[in-house]
Amino acid sequence: MYEEMDKLIEKASILIEALPYIQKLYGKTVVIKYGGNAMINDKLKNWVMEDITLLKYIGVNPIVVHGGGPEINSVLKKLNVESQFVNGLRVTDMQTMEVAQMVLVGKTNKELVSMLNQKGGKAIGICGIDGNLIQARKHYEIVNGEKVDLGYVGEVVSINAKVLEMLAKDEYIPVVAPIGVGEDGTSYNINADTVAAEIAKAIKAEKLMFMTDVEGLKYDKNSSEIISAISADEVLKMIDEGKIDGGMIPKVLGCIDALKHGVNRTHILDGRIPHCILLEIFTDKGIGTMIHL
């Protein structure tokens, strides 16, 4: 009996620990970039959907931006189309663009919306074409001082914040696929990390969170010690020193850009940890790395 009572008291203490964070975030908007292993592993996917739904029920307004690289790769492989990347960006010809749009908008987006709705949320799936949400233009990557044409790869020109605010501040959970639209109606494939940061900037989100397949930032990659909090200046220094590289660079640069444009806090989370979103937001210690100015 006493053992059972201790467990109940422990649960109550967890709720009490979360109370000040719930009060602080009530009515605020949190942008979550959902990607990595948490999109592939069914158990992790289920926990993420539970976290996002719970946020909405306690008065926080989550906006989800998702990737879909592995699924795009899978479809392209079946079509015998070889994927090419330049500085981590997918070279996107017309066929690849059609596949990316089909997978991101027609499959991945709708699966996430369905899962959130099954959890009791009211999710709405949209992409940058809807309501001119993401106005984009063609992106050229600079390689060795030369401009490289990546095809239908875009960069964000502007975000129609009104669309997202209207949904998020009501009872809905917007789920955004990173497809943008040009002035002439051309669709563009845009890096999902960049889209998440641009959305967070446009709506002045309270938090921007990137789910990744790493524990967090480290001064030494061989160390088990995670940096719990770090300044933007320190992050830039780590990039210069080669301690941050690859796919982590657009994430941390997105964090810094968002902070400079009014986002209060940014986070790099290990999406492989069950309920990582709740653990970061509603516990004293948190997990992962918080980046601040």
Swiss-Prot record:
Q: Name one GO cellular component term.
A: cytoplasm
Q: Which UniProt keywords apply?
A: Amino-acid biosynthesis, Arginine biosynthesis, ATP-binding, Cytoplasm, Kinase, Nucleotide-binding, Transferase
| Positions with a binding annotation for substrate | 68-69, 90, 189
Enzyme Commission number(s): 2.7.2.8
The protein's site described by Transition state stabilizer is found at: 33, 251
- Output the GO biological process annotations, alphabetical, semicolon-separated: arginine biosynthetic process via ornithine; L-arginine biosynthetic process
| MF-aspect GO terms | acetylglutamate kinase activity; ATP binding
Q: What is this protein called?
A: Acetylglutamate kinase
Source organism of this protein record: Caldicellulosiruptor saccharolyticus (strain ATCC 43494 / DSM 8903 / Tp8T 6331)
